[in-house]
């Protein structure tokens, strides 16, 4: 190990959403003098506006700073920031791959939450050193002793190693850096071996092309080197290497154990896949960095421009967004109701909301999303097996042998008094209870197996409202199970509207159909003719409502008494309405499509 290597510390901060991770990162960077009063702003590592506004971290980010420790040595600190929301677990797992240790933040006023546990397990899988940090000790509700007990009992960590801080006021934050130098090991690796570096993130810059963030495990890399991407076999020449001190700072070379970036004239992020291994073209390493998993989309939905003329702009925008979002999957699709658009695969509902918001914001588009769906398995009587995520591809019921849907193992951590509410919510969502564990006297961990389709449909919102926001949720896929699935069509004026179709469990079809139709009745404006609204499965109508006709006063121009004249005009109007009804196209406003997403 080189002298320089023993003074490098690569660490990540993991926490449940809202436990103060980005605030602690800000304080560490202030101590490392990366930010000064001129560059200082809150959540410095959250580079997107949307991250600051929502108070969440979406993209994994990083910063390098120097720290003069009490032992008289100057350490190079590489902080890799990670997201806390369950949708972005893949961003967490790849940042952890580049670290030797993590700071695990626990909010001293809230205690251990579901995401704390999930991220802890990710860190344990990678065999990282874990340093517990109790944050928000300045709050009146903070209970440090109780939090220490939870750290020992729920997390299985040594409470004596825990550091109590307030990231907001800066209290005791320096002690965190001292403990990093003492508890988190320096990076291993051989600086004389062939180059082996992990791509843990990459993003597209319009001026420089793709900027690749890497962690060097063996060897070194410098400007002018010809590099090879091991998964694609493509090679490039390095134009610049450096480290990120909030801004990209070029340097001569990157050595073993360092975290930094390279720019090599790469045009597409798909040529620098996250999790890929970079090596030298002339002297490649024998094996790539192990253990990386590709992010798999869990939720699928149609995405259409409200104005059909914006389709080309949407194509351009979604291609550009894909450059910075490795988990986004999409293919073109067309809908009779909405025209041309895309079928998009997302990591979860928050990811879906954020992608739509970024497309609308950054590319000035007006978009509409259809009801989200998951990937179902359909087994046909002729032996074929098909995976579908789009209701339009659901086969005729007569040809189906069996259907299966994905389940997830969901962990809910809640205060004691809300257990009853959560149990009834889980039952309503077809959940199967697996386990109940009392973490403390007043905190319970409930584990359920729940269909993913039920989880993505308002489960999180209802969980928060049933528990006044105190419960937390984490989930992981647990495989497919046989399920009675049907395709439900919504008919407006006798015509099925493809964008409103959905795949539902047979037991839920009537309830969902009725909810949607009642919503549509309020949202579709009255026309000059009556509009029947129906929810149907196969040929069977499950629910029906009607929007009454708008009556135009055709007799207004008749002054005085001639009753036969009035009758004649009313008959004429009736005829006209009949004709209008046959060719009558009902205008469905955009809110109607959005309402289907939120029928509670």
UniProtKB/Swiss-Prot annotation:
Tell me which GO cellular component terms the UniProt record holds.
Answer: plasma membrane
Compartments (UniProt record) = Cell inner membrane
Which superkingdom, per the lineage? Bacteria
Predominant location: membrane
PROSITE patterns named in the record: G_TR_1, G_TR_2
Q: Which SUPFAM superfamilies match?
A: EF-G C-terminal domain-like (SSF54980), P-loop containing nucleoside triphosphate hydrolases (SSF52540), Translation proteins (SSF50447)
Gene3D superfamilies reported in the protein's UniProt record: 3.30.70.240, Elongation factor 4, C-terminal domain, Elongation Factor G (Translational Gtpase), domain 3, P-loop containing nucleotide triphosphate hydrolases, Translation factors
> Which InterPro entries does the record cross-reference, listed alphabetically?
EF-4, EFG_III/V, EFG_V-like, EFTu-like_2, G_TR_CS, LepA_C_sf, LepA_CTD, LepA_IV
Span of domain tr-type G: 6-188
Topology with respect to the bilayer:
Peripheral membrane protein
Q: Which UniProt keywords apply?
A: Cell inner membrane, Cell membrane, GTP-binding, Hydrolase, Membrane, Nucleotide-binding, Protein biosynthesis
A GO molecular function held by the record: GTP binding
- Enzyme Commission number: 3.6.5.n1
The family note in this entry says: Belongs to the TRAFAC class translation factor GTPase superfamily. Classic translation factor GTPase family. LepA subfamily.
Described function: Required for accurate and efficient protein synthesis under certain stress conditions. May act as a fidelity factor of the translation reaction, by catalyzing a one-codon backward translocation of tRNAs on improperly translocated ribosomes. Back-translocation proceeds from a post-translocation (POST) complex to a pre-translocation (PRE) complex, thus giving elongation factor G a second chance to translocate the tRNAs correctly. Binds to ribosomes in a GTP-dependent manner.
What HAMAP family has UniProt attached to this entry? LepA
Question: What name does the UniProt record give this protein?
Answer: Elongation factor 4
The gene designation is lepA
């Amino acid at each position: 190990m080189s002298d320089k290597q023993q003074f490098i510390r690569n660490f990540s901060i993991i926490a449940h959403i809202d436990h103060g991770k980005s605030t602690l990162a800000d304080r560490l960077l202030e101590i490392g003098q990366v930010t000064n009063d001129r560059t200082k702003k809150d959540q410095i590592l959250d580079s997107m506006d949307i991250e600051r506004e929502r108070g969440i971290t979406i993209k994994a980010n990083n910063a390098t700073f120097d720290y003069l420790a009490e032992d008289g040595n100057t350490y190079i600190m590489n902080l890799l920031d990670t997201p806390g929301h369950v949708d972005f677990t893949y961003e967490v797992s790849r940042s952890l791959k580049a670290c030797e240790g993590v700071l695990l933040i626990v909010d001293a006023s809230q205690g251990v939450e579901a995401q704390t546990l999930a991220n802890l397990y990710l860190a344990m899988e990678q065999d990282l050193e874990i340093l517990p940090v109790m944050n928000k000790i300045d709050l009146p509700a903070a209970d440090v002793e109780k939090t220490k007990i939870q750290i020992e009992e729920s997390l299985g960590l040594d409470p004596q190693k825990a550091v109590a801080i307030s990231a907001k006021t800066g209290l005791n934050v320096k002690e965190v850096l001292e403990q990093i130098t003492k508890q988190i090991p320096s990076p291993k690796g051989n600086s004389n071996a062939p180059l082996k570096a992990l791509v843990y993130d990459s993003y597209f810059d319009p001026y420089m092309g793709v900027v690749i963030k890497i962690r060097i495990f063996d060897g070194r890399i410098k400007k002018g080197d010809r590099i090879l991407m091991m998964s694609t076999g493509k090679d490039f020449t390095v134009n610049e290497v450096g480290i990120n001190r909030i801004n990209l700072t070029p340097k001569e070379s990157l050595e073993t154990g360092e975290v930094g970036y390279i720019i090599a004239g790469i045009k597409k992020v798909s040529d620098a896949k996250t999790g890929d291994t970079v090596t030298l073209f002339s002297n490649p390493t024998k094996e790539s960095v192990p253990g990386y998993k590709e992010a798999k989309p869990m939720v699928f939905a149609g995405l259409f421009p409200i104005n059909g003329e914006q389709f080309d702009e949407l194509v351009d925008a979604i291609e550009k967004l894909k450059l910075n979002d490795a988990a986004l999957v999409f293919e073109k699709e067309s809908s009779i109701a909405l025209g041309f658009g895309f079928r998009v695969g997302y990591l979860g509902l928050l990811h879906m909301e954020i992608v739509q918001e970024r497309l609308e914001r950054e590319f000035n588009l007006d978009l509409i999303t259809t009801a989200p769906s998951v990937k179902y398995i359909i087994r046909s009587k002729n032996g074929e097996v098909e995976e579908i995520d789009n209701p339009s591809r659901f086969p005729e019921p007569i040809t189906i042998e069996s259907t299966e849907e994905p389940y997830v193992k969901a962990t809910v951590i809640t205060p004691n008094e809300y257990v009853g509410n959560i149990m009834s919510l889980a039952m309503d969502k077809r959940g199967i209870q697996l386990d109940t564990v009392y973490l403390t006297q007043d905190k319970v961990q409930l584990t359920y197996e729940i269909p993913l389709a039920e989880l993505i449909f308002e489960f999180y919102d209802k969980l928060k409202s049933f528990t006044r926001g105190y419960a937390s949720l984490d989930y992981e896929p647990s495989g497919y199970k046989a399920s009675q699935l049907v395709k439900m069509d919504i008919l407006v004026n006798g015509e099925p509207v493809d964008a409103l179709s959905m795949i539902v469990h047979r037991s839920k079809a009537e309830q969902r159909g009725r909810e949607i139709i009642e919503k549509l009745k309020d949202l579709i404006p009255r026309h000059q003719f009556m509009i029947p609204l129906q929810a149907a499965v196969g040929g069977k109508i499950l629910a029906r409502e009607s929007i009454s006709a708008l009556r135009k006063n055709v007799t207004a121009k008749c002054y005085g008494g001639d009753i036969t004249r009035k009758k004649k005009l009313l008959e004429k109007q009736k005829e006209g309405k009949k004709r209008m009804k046959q060719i009558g196209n009902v205008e469905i406003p955009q809110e109607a499509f959005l309402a289907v997403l939120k029928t509670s």
